[in-house]
Amino acid sequence: MIPTSVTNSPPPAGLGQNGASASLGSATAAAGGGMLSGLGMVAVSGCGSAGTGAQNNYGSVVLGLASLILEGRPIADDEYQQQTVGVVGSGAATAGSGGGRLSPRPSTSRAAINITTNPYGSMGGSENRAVNGSGSTGSPSSSSLTHQRWTQKLCQLRQISPAAQTMSAEPELVSLAINDLNKDHGDYEIVRRVMLNRAGGTGLVSSAGGGTNNSSAASSPGSNSSDNILHSLQSLATTCLRGGPALAPPPSVESRPLNLAFHWSGLGGSGGRGLGFGGGAASISNTPTTTATATASSGASSSASRPKHGPHCDQFLRKMGLAKGEMPSEAEEHICDMSYVNMTCNRWRAYCMKMEAILARREPVCIEVYLGPVSHKLLLEQWIICGREKVPPPTMTLPSLCSAIRSQLYFSQIVAWCDLLRKCDPSVYDSGRVIFSNCGNNAGDLATSYTTCGGQKRPRLNIFYRIKQHTTTNSNSGLHQEDGFSAKANVHNFPNVNVSESYSISVSVRSLPRINGGLPHVEPLPPSPAPRSLRPCGGDPASTPTGGGGLHAATPTGLGARTSALTPTTTAGGSNCDNGKPGMGQILDELDGDTSLSHRERQLQKYRKRMQRRDKKRERKATPDRLNSRQQSEEPMDEGEESQTQSQTTSETQSLALTLQQPRRIAMISTGTQTSLSSCQQCGSEKTLLCLSCTGGGGAHGGSNGTANGSTNGATDDGDDSDTTASEMEETSSCSLSSADLIVGTPRNNAELLLQAIQRTPKNRNRKPHPGVLDQVSCRNADLNGGQNNNLLKATPATSGCQVCKRQKTQHNFANGKVHQPTNGKQASNGYASMHLEAEKQPDVVQILATKLTPNIERCSLNPVERCKTPPPGVADHIVVQFKTPLSQVPAKHQPDAMVPLQQQQLGKSSSKPAQLRLNCGSNLLESETPPPMTSPQMRKALPKVNLTTIFCSSAPIAIGCPAFSFDPAALSHARSQLLAPDVSVTPPVQKSFSAPTLPHAASLSVSPRFSKQALAAHKRRSRHLSDRSDRSSLGSDEQLSDEDLESGLCSPAGGSPLKCRARLAAQFGGRPLLGNLEESLLQRRLMPKIEVMGFTLQLGASGGFCPTQVNIPAVSYFYELHGETLSTPYLCEIRLPRKGYSVPRSGTVQATLLNPIGTVVRMFVIPYDMRDMPPLHRTFIRQRILAEELSQDQDEGHKVPRSPTVTSTTSKLGHFISAEQMKRLRYSIHLKFQTSRSGRLCLHTDIRLLISRRTDCDTAAAHAKGVLEAPNELVTDTMMPAEPRYSARQESAGRI
C-alpha cells in the first residue's frame, strides 16, 4: 500500500509490507494534526492544520507526474514474463483458516526465515503474530486471469504490446528492508520473491480478494485506444491520486512495532503462529500484539485515514480509465488483495516515502535516472518537478504535459537500448550494464529442494533511479560537472501548467546526449555476469538478510541495487566479516545519495578523486623501497574487505572512502608502541606540520614534507580500514597547506578544502636529487649575494618539471634582500616548513609567502631550482621578468652562474621547446650580473631575434634599471621618437612568425645596417600580403588574415581599453602629412579616425571573359570628426584582399556591394574597365566617384557633366584632385588597385578602399524643405585612371613573384 501519513519529521524506518498480514498506510498524523490525503504525501503545517486545496492539488500532480516518469518507461517488462517453477519443496504450506484465503505461504523458505534476522530492522525474532482484524470474507476468484488483465493494463501504460511477450500468471512476493542506521529518511532494499505454485507448477492457488469489497475480477478489460490512454494520464495527475475522506476505522486489533510511526492493520488469515508473508508484505514484530490505542500519539489514532491504492490494483486502473466498470464508493475502504501485490506496488511505496519529506518541505523533486552498475553509474536523465507562483498564461494543459512526458520517455535512449536487448545484440551483453538472472544462490531464489535453470527471465538493463531534493546552484560553468553528467546535458523545459488559480507546476528534463555505438562499456569489464553480487567472505557461502547468496538487483529500479552494498555480509554463524563496520560501498553510496552536500563540496570531492587517481598512477613508478613499505602497510587491509563490485579493488575503495568521507586517522608504523603523528618522532615535541624543536636534517626519513616515515617493518592496525600509514600520508600531505590533515582525528573544514582546490597543488614527492645538482644549488646560493639566500624553496630541485603551470609564459620572481637564511645544499627540506621555521626564529623579518602554485618549475625557467613567488608589497630591489621567445639558446641570466647550463645546452643538442629570456633588473646586483666578455658576442647575436614588444610598446612604465638595456629618461625619449618615426610607424614592430627577424629597429641594437634593411624589407613585404592558405570562397576566416591585420586589430572586434585602441589607430593613421584634398587624405589614411566600427561586409564579383566566384570579405569602417565643419564627414571602409588577390578578366565589370553590420545594402558600385593592353608585371588603379549634381535653371545642356556610368576615359572631367566645392557634392568613392602577374593574369590586389558620405538624409531634407518630392539633384558617376603613364612597372623583381 501507499503510506499516506506525513509528519513534520521523517518517519522512522521499519520493516513491514501491506498484504495478507499487514496493511501499511493506516497511520496517524503527528501532534494531532490534520492530514491531506495525497498519494504518499500529506502536507502538515506547523500548527497541525490542514493545508489548502491548492497544496493538495499540487502534491497530487507532482506525485502523478513522478509516477509517470518512474513507471511509464517500458524497461521492466520481465516482471510479467512467464517463469517455470520447479517442484515445490515440502515446506510450502497453506494457511487459510481465518479468512478463507488459500494463499501459499512458504513457511520454511529461506526468504521468510531470514527476514526476521534483518540487522537493519528494529525488530528481531523468528515469530510473526498476525491477527485477523478485518474479517476478510471475499469469495475466491480466478487470480490468474485478474493478474493477466492487470499486467495488460500496466503494459498499456508503458506502451508495451502484451502480445510481444509471454505474460506471467504468477503473483509476486516482495520483501522490503528499511535501513535507518545512517539515513534520516531510510533506505530501501527490495528483493523480489516469486510465490511457489502447488505441486505441478501449472496452476495458481485460488485466493480471495483480501480487501473489503474488492471486485477486481468483475471488472472488464479496458480499452486500448489513444483517447483512453490520454484520459488516463489526465486522471493520473489529478483525481486518481486522491483518496476518500477518513472514516472511523472498524474495530480491529493491530500489531504496532515500538518504533514505527505507522499502524499495521492485520488483514491476514489465521491468527495462529505463522508468517504473514503475502503479496510482498510482512508485519514482523517480536513484541506482543497491542491495540491501536496503546501507542497512539495525541489520541489521533481514531482518525487514521484509509489505505490508498497504488498503481497495481484494479481500482487504480479504473480511475485511470484503463479499466471499465462501476466506480466503487469513495467512502469504502480499499485494500489490495495480497495475492496480486507485485513489485510495482512495493517499489512505488518506496518511491513515495522518498518523496514524502521533500514535498512536505515544498521543495522541488529531482528524479535521476542512472545506468548501472553503481560503481560505474552513468547519469542519463534528470527530471525536475517544481512548483512556482503563477506565471503568464501557460501554453500547455495537464493532459498535454503528460503526453509530452510520455513521448520523451518513449523516444529516449533507454528504450532504444532495451530494443537492442530484445534483439539479443551481443554488444549489449558484453557492456557490463545488464542484469542477468542466475540459476542458484541468488536473492530471488527460494529454499526449494532444487531449482531449474530453464525458463529464466531475460536479461535487462541495469537502470535505477534516485529521488532527491533539487538544489539550485549559482554557478553557470561546467553544467555537466555540477549535475553529474559526463557531457554537456541537453535541457528541455516543458511549458508551465497551472494547477490552481495562483500556483503552477514546472517540469524540466536534462538528458545526456545520444551515445553512438550502443551501450557504453564498463572498464574494466566485470568478470562475472552478475556485476552487483557481493563476494563471499573467506570462500564460505554467505547469506544475506533476505536469503540467497549475494544481493542481486532484480528490479529496474536502483533501490535494491543501491542498498545491496549497505547490507553487511554475514556468515552462517552470524559473525560479520568486517567486524561490524559498514562496507565501503555504504560510504560511497552515502556520498552519492546525500542531498545535503552543496555544489562546492561535490566539486571538491571530484577534485580529490582526480588527485587520488593521479597519485595511484604515480605509485606504479615509485622506488622499490617505497613499494615495499606500501605493500607492508596495505596487506592487512585486504582481509575481510567487501567490495561493491568485483571490478573495484579494495585499495581504490579504501582511498576514496578515506579521502572523501571520513576524517584522517593515521596508523603509525613502528617497531614499538604507536605514537601520534602530532608529536615529533625524533624529540617527542608537539608539532603541526614540522617539528619546531628539531634543527637537524633527520636523515633520509626527514621527508620533503616534514612527516616522519618511521620504520617499515611493523604492521598496521587491521581493525580499521580507513587508517593509512605515515608514508602514505607523506604522499598526500602536500595537497593542503593546512596542518589539519596531519592531526589525528581532525576533519577537514570546507575552507581548507576550497583552498586546496583553488591552488590545484600537485603532490610533492621525496625525490632524491642528483648530487651534482645539489652542489650546483649550494654553489649558486653561496655565490649569489655573498651567501645570501632570498628563496628557501630553491633548496628543493625539480627533476620532473612543472606539473601545473604548463601555460605559464611569464615568471616574475620577486626577492627581498632583507631575509638572510643560509641553507645546506645536502638537505632537501620542504619550503613551507623552512619558512615556518624561519618565521619562528626571525619574527621581525618580512616573510615572503609562496603561493605553491608551481612547486616544481622546469619548463617555466632555465634555472631548474627557481620557484614562482608572490611579490611582497614594497619590494622592488630585485625583479626577474621572463618573456617567451622563439629561441632555445637565449642566455638565461646576466650572471656567471647562469652561463653554466647555457653553455652545456649549446654544446649539446638544441631543445625543441622555446626557452625564456630572463632579465634580471636590480641596481644592487650590477657587479655580480655583468656578462663576461666571452659571452657578450653571443648575447648580441641573439638579441635581434628577441621579441621585446612587451617592453617597448607597453603602456605602463617599467621603472627598473637594467645593466643590459638602459632605461634612463634620455634613452626612453629617444626610443619614443624612434617608435613614432614617420618611415616606420605604419608597420608596427610586431610579427608572429618565428622565422624572420622581428625588430625593424635592429640598427639600434648593434646590428649591421644591411641586416636591418633586409629585415625591414621582408617585414613590409610579408605584412602587405595575406597567408598562402587563403581561399577565395571564404575570405572571412581568421586564418586568411595577414599578420599585420591580426596584430594591429584591423580585422578583429573593437575591444580592449580605449587608450590602447587610440594608440593603435595613431600608429596606423598618424605621423604622415596631409595631401592635396580631403578625399586623398582619407583614402591614403592620413587623418586620425575618431572611431572604428566592425561588421561591414563587401560582396565582390566580376564579369567578362569569365566570371570568378563571388566572395564576401569583411570590411572595417573608420569614422572621422573634423573640428569646425558643419557638414558631416565621409567615413572610410577598408577591405583587405588575400595575398594572391582576386582574379578578374582582362576586360569586364567589377561589382562591389557594401553591406552595413545589420546586412542592409549601403551602396552597390559597378566599375567597368578595359585593361587588355596592360603588360605583365605592371599595375594601375581605377577610382570611381559618385557625386550629386545640382541642376540650375540657366545651366547649358551642353556643359553638363556626363552621367553615364560607363565612362572609362582616362581624362576625367573632375581631374585627380577635386576642389572643396566638388568635395561637398561627393557621395561615394571607390579605389581599386589592379596588377598583372608574370603570366599576364589580371587581379585586384592589396585592398579596396571606399568613401561613403552620409549626406543622403540631408539631401532628402533639403528637397522636402523646397517642397519637391524628389531630391533636387542627380547622382553623377565619374571614373578615373592614371593618364601618363597608364601602367607602371611593379617594384618587385620577376624572381620574387
Curated annotation (Swiss-Prot):
SMART domains: DUF4210. Residues 1-22, 117-149, 206-227, 287-311, 518-655, 704-741, 1017-1048, 1192-1213 are annotated as: Disordered. GO terms for cellular component: nucleus. Keywords: Nucleus. Transcription regulator that synchronizes transcriptional and translational programs to promote macrophage invasion of tissues. Required in macrophages for their early invasion into the extended germband. Induces transcriptional expression of metabolic enzymes as well as of the translational regulator pths/DDX47. With pths/DDX47, adjusts transcription and translation of a subset of OXPHOS genes to increase mitochondrial bioenergetics and allow macrophage tissue invasion. The protein contains 2 transactivation domains (TAD). Each of these domains may be required for transcriptional activation of a subset of target genes. This is Protein Atossa.
